[in-house]
């Protein structure tokens, strides 16, 4: 079945897209084969949430604007020369221009609106007319690797929660959350890796079943009583996907006087039209109402979010460690009259910012060969190059044992400024000498230390009050372009929705060449260095010390850095 409109063909149930494997090229070089394979990988049915609709994750986060645009992007990448650059505007290939061999092969801008018009209402009107596409973060930038992409960040957060609130011991404790989509689906596995049990409330049964199949959740429950019994009846951490609505289950726990140890949420609350099921509605009713009365859906969804947030606040008052996990649900509740919605913190200022100050964030890579052995060899190389980090080694061991690859084999690994370029150069050398069967691509989430401005998430509560300053991700994208990343993206609205974030991404191909080594050395140093720069500029001492140790040239801070011991 296909569905076409002014938007072009957005639904085609006859299509199954998978990235090519092996060393046979469809494009003219690995520098254009890499974005081709990663675009296709984003739409692999083992990777994407709704591949037939081009939706990768995060509500309506798409890889291409419509199927006509997808086909044309593929066609262009197959013919693109190594001195040309393809421009993609909100999922639509709009131009090919002469550049040079060290320039990016693809430059992408997704979902960007002039600030006064940067809201869901205006975006949705443009989207209906086929003029825009929501790229989320890694959906429209072609570097989504399935739920693994956020597992380690979520794991690091839960480990930090255990350290801060429970003396580092999560045994016998449990987390309540909502949402098992592409991002939220990482929560159950991350929680059990960190030693917590978890009840994850999800209204779409197919998503629970998918997480069961891929090993991200342990069990499914149809009632709250059943879920509570499951986590009580075990000596080991266990995760349960509970079929229900978070706006119903969270208040029910308050009513029953049952207080989880930790409370958070990863529903797609950032998009009230497409991402959150109103209380009392069926999935079918919501789908029908989205066609008939969008305003009513948004109104009902935001009212339901307010109910959920009030319950989260009540549970916080009763002693639960409560945190916002970056979906902007507090903002939605605030707009619905929950004046104290921001009384519980976001996860970045509460637990992650010290890592950002050292440029540490979600470094990821994928094996274009399709062979898992290439990833296992790179895992070992990471251990060799970073021998004195048992926490990182433990993560890599757990990842190999417990994480199922989705699509092309890939790995996520939080490392910082002092290590990223070293790892990239080592991977490139492994390709050069034949240790790996084909090139590797290295990218990251847009959720990183220097690549995002998001006052309700990554840049919440900055020391100098610069939460909303979005010059930083723009500079990051420009620098990665100048440095020669293979493709660079600049997006708006990812994670927290329209009007609340701007962010940039980069991917670089390790094809084993000497030219690639030069590009890798530049890009994988500069990219995390912008994060250290951004946090040092905001006044964070950890970032200043890192800048001094890594010999960054920060003109307004150099005199101060020179005095640090």
From Swiss-Prot:
Signal peptide: none annotated. NAD(+) binds at residues 58-59, 136, 182-184, 202, 207, 245-246, 266-270, 276-277, 325, 495. Pfam families: Urocanase, Urocanase_C, Urocanase_N. It is an enzyme of class 4 (lyase). Its cofactor is NAD(+). Keywords: Cytoplasm, Histidine metabolism, Lyase, NAD. GO terms for molecular function: urocanate hydratase activity. Coiled coil: none annotated. Binds 1 NAD(+) per subunit. Catalyzes the conversion of urocanate to 4-imidazolone-5-propionate. InterPro entries: Urocanase, Urocanase-like, Urocanase_C, Urocanase_central_sf, Urocanase_CS, Urocanase_N, Urocanase_Rossmann-like, Urocanase_sf. The active site is at 413. HAMAP family: HutU. This is Urocanate hydratase. It comes from the Bacteria. The keyword Cell inner membrane does not apply. Belongs to the urocanase family. It catalyses: 4-imidazolone-5-propanoate = trans-urocanate + H2O. Pathway: Amino-acid degradation; L-histidine degradation into L-glutamate; N-formimidoyl-L-glutamate from L-histidine: step 2/3. The keyword Cytoplasm applies. It is found in: Cytoplasm. GO terms for biological process: L-histidine catabolic process; L-histidine catabolic process to glutamate and formamide; L-histidine catabolic process to glutamate and formate.
């Amino acid at each position: 079945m296909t569905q076409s409109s002014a938007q072009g063909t957005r639904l085609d149930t006859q299509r199954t897209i998978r990235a090519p494997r092996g060393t046979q090229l469809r494009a003219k070089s690995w520098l254009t084969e890499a974005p081709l394979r990663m675009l296709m990988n984003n739409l692999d049915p083992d990777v994407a949430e709704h591949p037939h609709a081009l939706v990768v994750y995060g509500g309506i986060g798409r890889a291409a604007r419509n199927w006509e645009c997808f086909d044309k992007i593929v066609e262009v990448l197959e013919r693109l020369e190594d001195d040309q650059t393809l421009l993609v505007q909100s999922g639509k290939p709009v131009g090919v221009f002469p550049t040079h061999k060290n320039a990016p092969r693809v430059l992408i801008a997704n979902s960007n609106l002039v600030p006064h018009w940067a809201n869901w209402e205006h975006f949705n009107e443009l989207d209906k007319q086929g003029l825009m596409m929501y790229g989320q973060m890694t959906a429209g930038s072609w570097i989504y690797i399935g739920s693994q992409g956020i597992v380690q960040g979520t794991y690091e957060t839960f480990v930090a929660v255990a350290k801060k609130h429970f003396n580092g011991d999560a045994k016998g404790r449990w987390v309540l959350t909502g949402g098992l989509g592409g991002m939220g689906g990482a929560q159950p596995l991350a929680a059990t890796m960190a030693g917590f049990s978890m009840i994850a409330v999800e209204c779409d049964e197919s998503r629970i079943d998918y997480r069961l199949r891929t090993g991200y959740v342990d069990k499914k429950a149809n009632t709250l009583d059943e879920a509570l019994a499951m986590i009580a009846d075990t000596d080991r951490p266990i995760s349960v996907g509970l079929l229900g609505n978070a706006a119903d289950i969270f208040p029910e726990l308050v009513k029953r006087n049952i207080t989880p140890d930790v409370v958070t949420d990863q529903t797609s609350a950032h998009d009230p039209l497409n991402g959150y099921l109103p209380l009392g509605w069926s999935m079918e009713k919501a789908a029908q109402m989205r066609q008939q009365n969008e305003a009513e859906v948004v109104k009902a969804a935001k009212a339901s979010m307010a109910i959920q947030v009030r319950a989260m606040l009540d549970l916080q008052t009763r002693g639960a460690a409560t945190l916002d996990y970056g979906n902007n649900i507090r903002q939605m509740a605030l707009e619905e009259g929950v004046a104290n919605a921001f009384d519980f913190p976001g996860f970045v200022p509460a637990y992650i910012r010290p890592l950002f100050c050292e440029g540490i964030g979600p470094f990821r890579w994928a094996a274009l060969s399709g062979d898992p052995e290439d990833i296992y060899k790179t895992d070992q190389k990471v251990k060799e190059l970073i021998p004195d980090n048992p926490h990182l080694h433990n993560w890599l061991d757990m990842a190999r044992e417990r994480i199922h690859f989705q699509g092309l084999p890939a790995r996520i690994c939080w490392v910082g400024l002092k290590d990223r370029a070293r790892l990239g150069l080592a991977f490139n050398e492994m390709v050069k000498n034949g240790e790996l069967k084909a090139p590797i691509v290295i990218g990251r989430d847009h959720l990183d230390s220097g690549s995002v401005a998001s006052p309700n998430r990554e840049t919440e509560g900055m020391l100098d009050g610069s939460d909303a300053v979005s010059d930083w991700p723009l500079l990051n994208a420009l620098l990665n372009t100048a440095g020669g990343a293979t493709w660079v993206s600049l997006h708006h609205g990812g994670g927290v929705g329209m009007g609340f974030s701007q962010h940039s991404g980069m991917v670089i191909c390790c094809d084993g060449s000497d030219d690639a080594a030069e590009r890798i050395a530049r890009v994988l140093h500069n990219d995390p260095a912008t994060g250290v720069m951004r946090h040092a500029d905001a006044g964070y001492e950890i970032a200043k010390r890192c800048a001094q140790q890594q010999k960054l040239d920060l003109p307004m801070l150099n005199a101060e850095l020179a005095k640090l011991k």
